[in-house]
């Protein structure tokens, strides 16, 4: 399994812990000068033994948006599956899964101003390979087999409120507060640079303590 050091703990910790079960974990490290994940570095890690590559659509640390489509095609060509954490991207852009080509894509609806629910897309090919985690009579259902206790119907119904929120947000952003819209990108760039400085500092500390 290949993980990155650009990920949130949610999409790296659980995979890293599988090392205690005998899995080999490889780390795809960011370029410390840019904060980017470089495809050539991934290519050097991929071989016939790799089953899964996990990485973020957007780093919650630096805000770096990765070229998911290109990366997923590279992973698929190597014969592995991809798992993309979309939680930091989902509030800021539309994830077109038909273009991204991810085998697994996950995010949390509370990050898009909805209820505290996890949302997962999984391709049919991989779905068929995984065991049923729900009731035995749902074993053949691609959508129910991964919900052990059944869906939370009240939470699911409240997802509709996300649309109401975005309609109000659109009105607020594009009808009013033009000066704030001008300043926001400048603040985002400042935050990115501060995050990059922090990442470099942690890498230096890690190398010093190695």
Name the predicted role of every residue range.
Residues 2-210:
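Pyridoxal 5′-phosphate
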């Amino acid at each position: 399994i290949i993980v990155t050091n650009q990920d949130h703990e949610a999409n790296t910790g659980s995979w890293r812990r599988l090392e205690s079960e005998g899995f080999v974990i490889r780390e795809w490290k960011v370029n410390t000068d840019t904060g980017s994940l470089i495809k050539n570095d991934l290519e050097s890690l991929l071989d016939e033994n790799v089953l899964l590559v996990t990485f973020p659509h957007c780093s919650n640390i630096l805000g770096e948006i990765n070229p998911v489509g290109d990366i997923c095609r590279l992973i698929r060509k190597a014969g592995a599956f991809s798992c993309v954490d979309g939680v930091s991207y989902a509030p800021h852009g539309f994830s077109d899964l038909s273009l991204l080509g991810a085998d697994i894509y996950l995010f949390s609806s509370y990050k898009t101003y909805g209820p505290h629910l996890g949302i997962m897309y999984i391709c049919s090919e991989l779905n068929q390979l995984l065991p049923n985690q729900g009731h035995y009579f749902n074993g053949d259902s691609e959508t129910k087999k991964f919900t052990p206790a059944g869906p939370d119907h009240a939470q699911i119904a409240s997802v509709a409120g996300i649309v109401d929120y975005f309609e109000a947000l659109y009105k607020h952003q594009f009808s009013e507060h033009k000066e704030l819209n001008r300043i926001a990108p400048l603040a985002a760039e400042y935050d990115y640079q501060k995050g990059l400085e922090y990442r470099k500092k942690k890498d230096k500390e890690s190398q010093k303590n190695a």
